Amino acid sequence: MSRSLVLAIETSCDETAVAVLRSPREILASEIASQIDLHRKYGGVVPEVASRNHLPRIRPLIEAALRRSGSSLAEIDCVAATRGPGLLTSLLVGYSAAKGLAIGLGKPFIGVNHLEGHLLSPFLQGPDRPLPSVNLIVSGGHTMLVQIIGVGSYTLLGRTVDDAAGEAFDKVAKLLELPYPGGPEIDRLAQQGNPRKFDLPRSMLNSGDFNFSFSGLKTAVRYLLPKLDGDFCADLCASFQEAVIDVLVQKTIRAAKRFGVNLVTVSGGVSANSRLRTKMTDASAAAGLELKLACPSLSTDNAAMIAFAALERFQLGYRSNLSDDADPNLKLV
């Protein structure tokens, strides 16, 4: 049986990414052009700057991905791109480029939900795992628990009611005047600190549901800062990080037990956090659950996960309508 080739483009935020994937899950190329240096002086992503800088990078990245994969456009079986959610002006760059390619080549086109890409990314490493599973998506823009029944069949178990976990990391990093991006910097400093030095709130830890809240934790850090002096940064980073991760880990394990699921998966940019990976590994083992973590290179935004989600849908016969537009508020469930 012939193996399908998918070319996918991801431009939902500030990373320009192109990947070529061969079924069932062989990453032939995964090219990423980062804009971190461009946005560092602003302390965060500026949408107009992001979209303008996607434009000159798309074609060179497509060409680079094809060269690295040893493939030609004629060999591509399906073209895919992130449809949403994300920054509209950024989404439009990759989505329009992919639709144009699909039309020009006469190939099927699939618009992919960015969150579905994250959701399925732990499975990209293989081998297959039995479903259903409970997945924690934890990133700068989203924090949610989702039960995966099968490809395209998802149940939302809980989500943040205010800030996403990654957003809380970024905001606390700004309060501490840490370099951008703040999340990895907090992770680095926390490894040198005492996670029990400061008693910070674990909001909604015992709420009885699977929702999250991190804005109160951020506010607690803001009110604590004026009272501190000396060399407190590492301890505060460790204490803040521990508070976030305690809630993420405990609610994920409880959800798996509540719904009788034996497999837990974790994905999204914050899943690269070293403390989260350690504590989720330990908690899953203690609960007798199997754990699948997206590898760090597939945790942050990338086109390989978009290609994989597209491939899974392509093989089920799904095709997108070329008249569909990018949707910055696209829902997963």
Regions found by a protein language model. Name each.
Residues 72-83, 259-270, 292-295:
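Short glycine-rich phosphate-binding loop at a beta-alpha junction
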Residues 4-85, 114, 118:
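N-terminal beta-alpha supersecondary unit
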Residues 1-3, 112-134, 309:
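Conserved phosphate-binding catalytic cores of ATP/NTP-utilizing and phosphoryl-transfer enzymes
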Residues 111-112, 281-305, 320:
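Conserved phosphate-binding/catalytic loops in two-lobed NTP-binding clefts
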Residues 81-105, 274-283:
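Short Gly/Thr/Asp-enriched flexible loops that form oxyanion-binding sites at enzyme active sites
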Residues 98-119, 288-293:
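Short, acidic/small-residue loops that bind anionic groups at enzyme active sites
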Residues 72, 188-264, 274-287, 314:
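A contiguous, well-structured pocket-lining segment that forms one wall/lid of small-molecule binding clefts
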Residues 2-5, 11-12, 19, 29-30, ...:
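A short helix-loop
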